[in-house]
A protein has these predicted regions:
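Conserved HGGG/HGGXW glycine-rich cap/lid loop of the alpha/beta-hydrolase fold
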Residues: 2-55
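Gly/Ala-rich beta-loop-alpha elbow adjacent to hydrolase catalytic centers
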Residues: 68-72, 76
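Flexible "cap/lid" loop of the alpha/beta hydrolase fold
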Residues: 81-82, 86-121
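Conserved alpha/beta-hydrolase catalytic His-Asp/Glu region
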Residues: 100-103, 120-177
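Short beta-strand/loop motif that positions the catalytic acidic residue
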Residues: 179, 185-187, 191
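Short alpha-helix in the alpha/beta-hydrolase fold that links the catalytic acid
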Residues: 181, 195-204
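Catalytic histidine neighborhood in serine/cysteine hydrolases
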Residues: 204-219
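Catalytic histidine-centered segment of alpha/beta-hydrolase-like enzymes
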Residues: 217-230
Length: 243
């Protein structure tokens, strides 16, 4: 379905990608959304989620709509906690709001060293691909190539920095519960990284949340199921504009 152009120039849409993701993550969704003002941000140049939040808030417009995927959702949640008056709508996709378990820190940093030694694409396919997408998409070579290409374009330094952002994050559930803007939670039913339970933890505390589970989706639902994601995002954007 082709939508008419949606004028959101007063509330531009800001899209934050996840670990080893760039604008390619959002392209299928953007093509279907047809909105006037949208920007895609690759998370770099910060050593923690709070630092990433501060740096983005320094350069973004006074008011905007914010959507984040995975690590991008963690940073988006931090931004909404830091400046709720500026975030006029929030969408979190494939998010785990909980702090990182201390016993996983060493393995996360070791993953960066292994990826550097083996090459990002080879490491990703052997270590992460099985958990990235729904079982029905594991043989989808185009999808795999897209995700690997993003990783290679981001590079190992970006991966190392994003790993530190993910490690150094806060539990912002209390701040999330206090948000009054239109809020959307999207998750894949078959996501083993950011599970449906993680999204239930967030949805339970905020009466303004709309939650949708993509039954056929894994972790990478913006790429796996853009036809299902885009209408939900467009409806959310429309609601934000009308508020």
């Amino acid at each position: 379905m082709e939508y008419p152009l949606l004028d959101n120039t007063d509330l531009p849409l800001v899209l934050l990608g996840g670990t080893l993701c760039n604008a390619r993550l959002w392209q299928p969704v953007i093509e279907r959304l047809n909105v006037a003002a949208v920007s895609c941000i690759t998370l770099t140049g910060a050593e923690s989620a709070p630092q990433a939040s501060r740096r983005l808030l320094e350069v973004l417009p006074p008011r905007f709509l914010l959507a984040g995927f995975s690590l991008g959702a963690i940073v988006a949640l931090q931004m909404a906690a830091d400046a709720p008056e500026r975030v006029n709508g929030l969408t979190l996709i494939s998010v785990n709001p909980l702090p990182v378990a201390p016993d996983t820190l060493a393995s996360r940093r070791e993953a960066v060293r292994t990826a550097q030694a083996r090459g990002l694409a080879d490491w990703l396919v052997s270590s992460l691909w099985q958990s990235y997408v729904a079982p029905s998409r594991l043989s989808d070579r185009i999808l795999q190539e897209t995700i690997c290409r993003m990783a290679q374009e981001c590079g190992i330094e970006t991966f190392a920095g994003q790993t530190e952002m993910a490690i150094h994050r806060q539990d912002n559930r209390t701040a999330f519960n206090a948000l009054s803007c239109p809020t959307l939670l999207l998750n894949g039913a078959q996501d083993v990284i950011c599970t449906p339970h993680h999204h239930q933890l967030l949805a339970a505390g905020n009466a303004n949340v709309t939650r949708h589970t993509v039954e056929a989706g894994g972790h990478f639902i913006p790429l796996e199921t853009p036809d299902e994601i885009a209408p939900l995002l467009r409806q959310w954007i429309t609601e934000c504009i009308q508020c």
